Amino acid sequence: MAEYQNIFSQVQVRGPADLGMTEDVNLANRSGVGPFSTLLGWFGNAQLGPIYLGSLGVLSLFSGLMWFFTIGIWFWYQAGWNPAVFLRDLFFFSLEPPAPEYGLSFAAPLKEGGLWLIASFFMFVAVWSWWGRTYLRAQALGMGKHTAWAFLSAIWLWMVLGFIRPILMGSWSEAVPYGIFSHLDWTNNFSLVHGNLFYNPFHGLSIAFLYGSALLFAMHGATILAVSRFGGERELEQIADRGTAAERAALFWRWTMGFNATMEGIHRWAIWMAVLVTLTGGIGILLSGTVVDNWYVWGQNHGMAPLN
């Protein structure tokens, strides 16, 4: 007899469009509700809109587009304005930061890193504007600021790579270039210059939390899908009248590993696992070159690497 596994299949039930909170809200500030999308319904809610951008949202989108446009123009220039070459070599093009001799100067010529500085400015404005928008939207809805703080952890790693560490090292040349393969080359070279990042304990912690995040996400997703036949994905019903879904899910994990997370606790585990990926990763990058020149030598001094 066939079973309903609910791994790929999705039942889409459509009712009236949900406008969200409308009490004491000026609906003129929101976009109208768009159509329903079957494709979006495979991944989440099929309803499009309403969308609220606000001043920070508009600023972020504009700055993000300018960042994308600046890099795109440079790649187009590197391709000699040839569309065939542009498509062929897209992954090889790169917008590099200023050379070491320019230090932290903003006076580098456009073709020698000046354009990288301009692109980085737009990216800085775009990311921080979007973070501010995330914070203010949560505040407007009376929610906690958990999403904004989690986003801040990712911003921390990005800031360390592109701004904080280069400033501490005294040169924009320490920053990451904009490009596909050049980004990978920078990562490889960074590890070689600083004596193998595998001996950086914060790098190890970051990888451990990354694996942990993947494991927790898979465990949580699989558990809810496994009890969806009992209504386990219907959060309101599970709060008011749990039925058998929550109990079966909890019992499964007690049978499997001796204890189970709670409906709330699993999300606390998940957010900390995810946040610590970029938090510890940023610390590891920041210490490289500023505090520890060679992680292999550091490992030798601390009994983590062979002495010969």
From Swiss-Prot:
GO molecular function ontology, one term from the record: electron transporter, transferring electrons within the cyclic electron transport pathway of photosynthesis activity
Pfam families assigned to the protein according to its UniProt record, in alphabetical order: Photo_RC
Cell location: Cellular chromatophore membrane
Transmembrane regions listed in the UniProt entry: 54-80, 111-140, 143-168, 198-226, 260-286
InterPro entries listed in its UniProt record: Photo_II_D1/D2_sf, Photo_RC_L/M, Photo_RC_L/M_CS, Photo_RC_M
GO cellular component: plasma membrane light-harvesting complex; plasma membrane-derived chromatophore membrane
Residues given in the record as (7R,8Z)-bacteriochlorophyll b binding sites: 183, 203
Signal peptide feature range: none
Superkingdom of origin: Bacteria
Binding site residues for a ubiquinone: 253
Keyword Electron transport in annotation: yes
Topology in membrane: Multi-pass membrane protein
Annotated positions binding Fe cation: 220, 235, 267
KW Transport (keyword) present: yes
CDD domains reported for this sequence: Photo-RC_M
BP term (GO), one: photosynthetic electron transport in photosystem II
Keywords: Bacteriochlorophyll, Chlorophyll, Chromophore, Electron transport, Iron, Magnesium, Membrane, Metal-binding, Photosynthesis, Reaction center, Transmembrane, Transmembrane helix, Transport
Subunit architecture: Reaction center is composed of four bacteriochlorophylls, two bacteriopheophytins, two ubiquinones, one iron, and three highly hydrophobic polypeptide chains (designated L, M, and H).
The protein's role, per its UniProt record: The reaction center is a membrane-bound complex that mediates the initial photochemical event in the electron transfer process of photosynthesis.
Family (UniProt): Belongs to the reaction center PufL/M/PsbA/D family.
The protein's name in its UniProt record: Reaction center protein M chain
